[in-house]
A protein has these predicted regions:
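Membrane-integrated ABC transporters
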Residues: 1-160
Length: 160
């Protein structure tokens, strides 16, 4: 389990909001940034993890907190993932190349991409936050083929 973070070590609400909004945009979720920010400010006394969970819920996301290292290395199977560095900075890792080079965005840099080896990120990381949509999004490719149940459909066919 991830150790609790003391308020002195807590990352500001705006940094978490920036990262979580980028994940919500990645999944195409409609969201209200102001609602998420207010949720984060109101949940500030409950600890950083509770604050991040509340903000994620307001954005339509579900989050899991994972410690870095051990059996769960930083791999492409968990992308996009938010990485909290030892100094408190947040980074959103969006891609990992075959050569081990990660594409990431740092909080507060307005979406500018940076490239660093994933081994360096794993060495400096203190926690990984995996955010996914809270519920499945409708698939526009399949929806036209799915019809609602019609009552008396057999009778209508037989009486034609």
């Amino acid at each position: 389990m991830t150790p609790p973070i003391s308020p002195a070590d807590a990352t500001p609400v705006d940094s978490w909001l920036d990262m979580l909004q980028q994940v919500a945009r990645h999944y195409g979720l409609p969201h209200s940034g102001q609602l998420a920010k207010l949720t984060g400010l109101w949940a500030g006394l409950d600890g950083e993890q509770a604050r991040v969970r509340g903000m994620a819920r307001a954005l339509g996301l579900s989050v899991r907190f994972r410690p870095v290292g051990g059996r769960e290395p930083l791999t492409g199977w968990r992308l996009p993932m938010i990485v909290r560095m030892a100094d408190g900075a947040l980074a959103l890792v969006t891609a990992i190349g075959e050569d081990g080079e990660a594409t990431l965005t740092l909080s507060g840099e307005a979406g500018l991409m940076a490239y660093r080896p994933i081994a360096d990120i794993a060495r400096e990381a203190s926690m990984v936050v995996i955010a996914r949509p809270a519920r499945a999004a409708p698939d526009m490719r399949v929806d036209p083929y799915i019809h609602k149940q019609e009552e008396n459909w057999l009778r209508r066919i037989l009486w034609q």
